[in-house]
Amino acid sequence: MNEDLQSATCSATSTPATASVGAESVGGAASVAVVQTEPQQTTKVEPHNVVGVGTETVSDTRRKRSTRFTMVKAIAIICVVLSHAGISGWLSHFVFIFHVPIFFLCAGYFFHTKYLNDAHSFVMHRVKGLYWPFVRWSVFFLVLHNLLFTCGILSEQPQFGNATMGVLHPYNWTQWSQHLWSIVFNMSGYNDFLCGAFWFFRALFVASLLFLVLFKILRKNSRFAQDKQAGWALLGCGVLLTLWKTTCGLHVTGLAQGGYRELLGLSFMAAGFLLRQYKVMERLTWKVAVPCAVLLLVASFLFPSSMAFNGKTLDFVSIFLPAIAAFIAIAYGCQFIDRRDTFVKRSLVHIGDNTLYIFAFHIVAFKVVSALKVACYGLPWEAVGGHPTVLNPASNVLWVILYLIAGVGLPLLWMAGYRRVHVYVKKGEARGVELLLTAGDYLLKGLGIALKGLLAGLVFLVLNFRKLSVAALKGIGRFFLGIYRGIKQTIKDIMSASSPEDE
């Protein structure tokens, strides 16, 4: 069910209400990172007469929802789609620096310390918003895996694979089962082509839990009683753990892809939390935003980086500050868009509210444009299986734009259609659940009867064990006695038949 963000009813000085990471929505999850109602000016509604009688008021005070960070997330997810749409060169370096880190920064920025005393709610939010969508959608594509080769959506031919000519292959039962286990127990094993971005679910899930655990541990020490002190300690832990991993080439045991993304995500969450504690966004001016934008541009030219799973120490150093700078600069720009109710603002807010679906399904949506590209260039249908797009010929600006529109638009279109029929779907689900419960009830009754019969038999055996044992022994004795007598009689008959006297 949707967990709609509610406007806060407290004053601007109160603690803002938050919606945690991946709050559950239609289909199982809402947007990727947390969205929060940011403090705004209190708007007083003047009293007015109702039909000319009395002085009743509609409301005394009202606070509007700030959509600035929703638009920040929208820009980030658009850049995620753009990075997979076939771009290259400087633009690719530019978007890879900040597009995914922004979601970790948002998660840390809106972390509420109330969860230190309510860890269960925090964990359940993450399970419902990150783990469950990951498992459900990964298993869905796993079920369709072999069929996708028949349809040509996936191909075993190297020229129709990824940029390194890597390809996937159909699974046998053992391979399929192993992938299922990896999905459920390790948040890995997903389809590397159609679900290639699903590592984000695991990274944010693990980073969020690690952030909470470390925060609770630090709070037990009086030195970290203040949020700022704890935030700096969390940042130090994240940075040191990441550097330890990269400098020594370590791998976090049991964590898919080694854990670099999870530790880097922890560092970004701590940085976002500190930005909130120091009220950087509330005091943000062009004097801060412009240098941040310059740092991002310089980094994209001189030392580009990304959240690749095999990141080195230089990659970590190159991405950390520029990504934070990008978050600040984009948030500064979005506050101007947030001032007026325009088409651009409404579009970005809608995209920002559905980032999880775009993140999960944009590569699948690319296949529609890939089919169009295959038709235009007269390529074999198997070329649709190229990951993430048709790689040869390379995409020009037109194809990049089409991939971008499809990657963002088609998941939104699908969700719009789903929301129109979700009432009927819910009714069908309720009926299905009712039938399952009824069947389960009959099954339990049958099992109960069988269990009662089994217990009655066991009781009878226990109570009559002596009698039954004696009867069984007598029966066995009679059986062997009969065999003995039969053998004896047979021998007698043979001896009688061969008697010399008769001869």
For each feature predicted by the language model, list its residue ranges:
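Intrinsically disordered, low-complexity cytosolic terminal tails
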Residues: 2-50
